[in-house]
Amino acid sequence: MSTAMKSKLHFRYSMVILPIFVIISHIILGFPLGIFGQTNTDATYQFVTKWGSLGEGDGQFDGQNDVDFYDGKVFVADYANHRVQIFDPYGKFIAKFGEGGESDGQFHKASALSMDSEGNLYIADQFNFRIQKFTNDGTFITKWGSEGAGDGQFLHPHVPANDAEGKLFVTDRDLANVQVFTDDGEFIMKWGSEGEGDGQLSNPESSIVDSQGNVYVADYGNDRIQKFTNDGKFVTKWGDKGTADGQFQGPSGLSIDANDNIYVTDKNNNRIQVFTSDGQFITKFGEPGSGDGQLIDPEGVGVDKESGAVYVADTGNNRIQLFEYQL
């Protein structure tokens, strides 16, 4: 990302007096000011720009389900167009790859994606019942998975997540579990079963991994977030059904920032909620509608860890929206 882009994302804040350590942390470490030490409850994320509409052309979407950010580029899983599209941070189209089909590099509903630390891209190829791995320019590397309930098989693979050791965590809505693989698809273990108890899941949508290796799962059907160790031991949970702060109606997408704060797309409440890694509510943004900053059935969310910019897959509006934190 260029210096000009970083400056635009970093410094469009109100004129306030801040402790010097917060300013230093923001300038040197790249932490968003509001999340690092902000106590102003009126501060939140504000709309910056948007792009996309319903269609098949470059920059158009049909049910885009997920979004991620890596090395100055925005990657979007364009679900019903069976492809991935790549943009610059402000929505200028760069490239695309994929088409409908069953061959290597083809998709039958590209439902979700994630990036590893080396820039490789993992796509949940939903109705081909597999994960496909690509370079970040769309070159096919490998694939794994088939239809079924056995180890390494899928019925409804959803958002994969990567840890610092190269392991990949894949949620499966219909199997109500999380499967763990090496970065080339070798099955390691799995955990989870259908239910409402601690460690049980109901239609899990996505997962994310923090800097300590803990795994967070959007437990969609139970309207909560669950936190696990990376070998599947239950740590904590938060949320229940409702519209208040910290409650959910269909938590779907997850992302994480440089401070291990967790971003959740609260799909049927048409908003994004932000929490600490132990589930303490920080802020929220979004409301129902099609105007700037409004959302309809948002699914995916991605955070640029350097600038703190937040990208939301505003699925019902067939667009991506960019937000930044402002005081």
Segments the model singles out, each with a brief description of its role:
Residues 36-327:
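Eukaryotic scaffold repeat domains enriched in small/polar residues
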Residues 28-38:
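Signal peptide processing junction and immediate N-terminal pro/mature segment
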Residues 1-11:
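N-terminal secretory signal peptides that target proteins for export/translocation
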Residues 17-30:
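Bacterial N-terminal signal peptides
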